[in-house]
Amino acid sequence: MLDDCEASGFINDKRYAELLVRSNIARGHGPIRIRQAIAQKGLTKDCIEAALIATDYDWFELAKAKAKAKAIKKYGVPKVTEVKGSQSRELIAKEKAKRVRFLLSQGFSYEQVIYALDYDPLEDNDD
């Protein structure tokens, strides 16, 4: 029965993997987390890699958008353009470490995280 469905095209691992990739991208997940989530569904590594390549998504910009959204959620609409004098370097370092851990937990590589945090999301007033 399942073989008939697969032969007819009703069951297609490639389409399913692409759907899962798009769904995870919409949630703001990075490629590492997406690979893990899809692998848990039982799809092969080749199928997962093909789906990730087919999306041709800019993971660096997704990481940057995720960092900005998190900063806005935490601090509100970005209006502050400089660090207050009362904040020490230690507090700034702790906050940056939190941001790094958050983005890593969302499935972004360290290189993507560094790109995303290379700017101050509280200074970016483009939106």
UniProtKB/Swiss-Prot annotation:
**One GO cellular component, as annotated:** cytoplasm
GO BP terms: namely:
regulation of DNA repair
Cellular location of this protein?
Answer: Cytoplasm
Q: Which family does it belong to?
A: Belongs to the RecX family.
Record protein name field: Regulatory protein RecX
Q: Which UniProt keywords apply?
A: Cytoplasm
What job does this protein perform?
Answer: Modulates RecA activity.
